[in-house]
Design a protein with these regions (language model features):
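Conserved adenine-nucleotide phosphate-binding loops and their immediately adjacent elements
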Residues: 1-8, 43
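N-terminal pre-P-loop "Q-motif" helix
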Residues: 7-29
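Conserved SAM-binding loop
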Residues: 10, 69, 177, 256
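Pre-Walker A (Motif I) flank of P-loop NTPase domains
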Residues: 30-40
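Short basic/glycine-enriched coil/helix segment immediately N-terminal to the Walker B
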Residues: 34, 112-150, 169-170, 371, ...
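Helicase P-loop NTPase motor core
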Residues: 223-267
């Protein structure tokens, strides 16, 4: 099968997957979609051409219904939008963005909107307000009444938890869920939408069979063990020792990944110092990562950017302007004590959720869970086994190494 618009020839497994996607779209358009056809799941490991197959299939259907293309993480949604635009897949009325932006609206008094200077309480106690790390944010959102599209495509579907999937299903529209069934499941609960996908892409397309990153990803996925050694130009694993000499290869554009938040905080502090940032406060030019969605400001969990201006206000806030990697400009009030904290400030005792403001932290290092949906040319992975089961470990390691596009350094044993 050849997708003429994109001049792409699909392989046999991609063609089978494309036909299944086309069937859902066409049956929805002519009203013949049966109940058991309301969900289609397509899985594929790194490099199998999942987005290419999706774009090809959608582009083959004339006069199709409007489609909502969405992903859990803002970064993943941004990457998806870029790929679909490049393929010429999008049509008038389609949606491309986060799941939260598609089906939720901030509840009055919730934590997902913006605060203004008038909301800043200068009389707040001067002591640092503790962060509890309570991650239950569901009370801050309500479901919208309906969406403008009649088909939902979920990318990076391995990140979707059971509650969000149930909310997506509640609209009664067919769902096409696409993801890498080798990656980590959602952080909360045992639900895994990609555990046993209905359709699987098997053949590697994104990079040559001999690509060292693909080889390393297979080792991670199949054995959970990557031996010490050099696997190709810029791709190697070294023994973890007490020396930090390897850190010299970490640059400002390197994605540094780890398993635990305490490790993330340590590396953020170490790299900040190395880059010449001496203050305990964030500074102009620093890389930051968003930790909480704010639709009003078009910032989403996992989105990264660079600070262009920053002013402290009161004891608990910064007024920050930043250029986000997705291309948008951010300006808003951020909770000061989130920077350098091990936990995320979803619940600050003595302060209403809406007054906490936006949540950012330094982005020189991040956990593998937070990196899902992102990719970088250069990646450094700090292996941290902690208490994971064998399957969890394989998924963690596989997810980590598949963030790399060109260079990969693994530090472990």
């Amino acid at each position: 099968m050849i997708m003429a618009k994109m001049d792409i020839r699909l392989s046999a497994d991609q063609e089978k997957a494309a036909e299944a996607i086309i069937s859902v779209i066409e049956k929805k358009a002519n009203g013949t979609l049966r109940g058991e056809e309301m969900l289609l799941t397509m899985g594929g490991f790194a490099g199998t051409g999942k987005t290419t197959t999706l774009a090809s299939a959608v582009g083959m259907v004339a006069n199709r219904p409007k489609i909502a293309f969405c992903a859990f993480a803002g970064k993943a949604a941004s990457v998806l939008k870029t790929k679909l635009e490049r393929a010429g897949t999008l049509a008038l009325g389609d949606y491309v963005g986060t799941i939260h932006g598609l089906i939720y609206r901030p509840r009055h008094g919730g934590s997902s909107g913006s605060i203004t200077e008038s909301d800043i309480d200068d009389k707040a106690p001067v002591e640092r307000k503790p962060i509890t790390g309570n991650t239950d944010q569901k009370m801050a959102f309500d479901l919208v009444d309906d969406i403008d599209q009649s088909i939902i495509v979920v990318d990076e579907a391995s990140m979707v938890n059971e509650q969000i999937f149930a909310d997506l299903q509640s609209f009664g529209y067919p769902i096409i869920a696409i993801g890498d069934h080798g990656q980590l499941p959602p952080v909360i609960g045992s639900f895994n939408l990609m555990e046993d996908p209905m359709i699987r892409l098997e053949k590697i397309h994104r990079q040559a069979e001999g690509d060292p990153i693909i080889h390393v990803s297979r080792l991670a996925r199949e054995t959970g063990r990557i031996p010490i050694g050099v696997y190709g130009l810029g791709v190697e694993k070294i023994q973890k020792t007490g020396s930090l000499a390897f850190a010299e290869r970490i640059g400002p554009s390197t994605m540094t990944l780890c398993g635990m938040n305490v490790t993330r905080v340590w590396w953020n502090n170490f790299l900040r110092t190395r880059y010449g940032f001496k203050s305990n406060d964030p500074e102009i030019g620093e890389r930051i990562i968003c930790l909480k969605n704010n639709r009003e400001e078009e910032i989403y969990n996992g989105m990264t950017g660079v600070i262009t201006s920053i002013v402290a206000k009161g004891q608990h806030w910064y007024k920050i302007s930043a250029t986000m990697d997705a291309g948008n400009l951010y300006e808003g009030w951020c909770y000061k004590h989130q920077f350098g904290s091990v936990k995320t400030a979803f619940n600050v005792p003595g302060m209403p959720q809406w007054q906490v403001g936006d949540l950012f932290d330094w982005a020189y290092a991040m956990t593998v869970h937070k990196s899902q949906g992102s990719e970088a040319d250069d990646v450094v992975v700090m292996e941290e086994r902690i208490s994971r089961t064998e399957d969890e470990w394989r998924r963690w390691l596989y997810t980590a190494v598949t963030r790399a596009k060109k260079k990969l350094l693994i530090v472990g044993s």
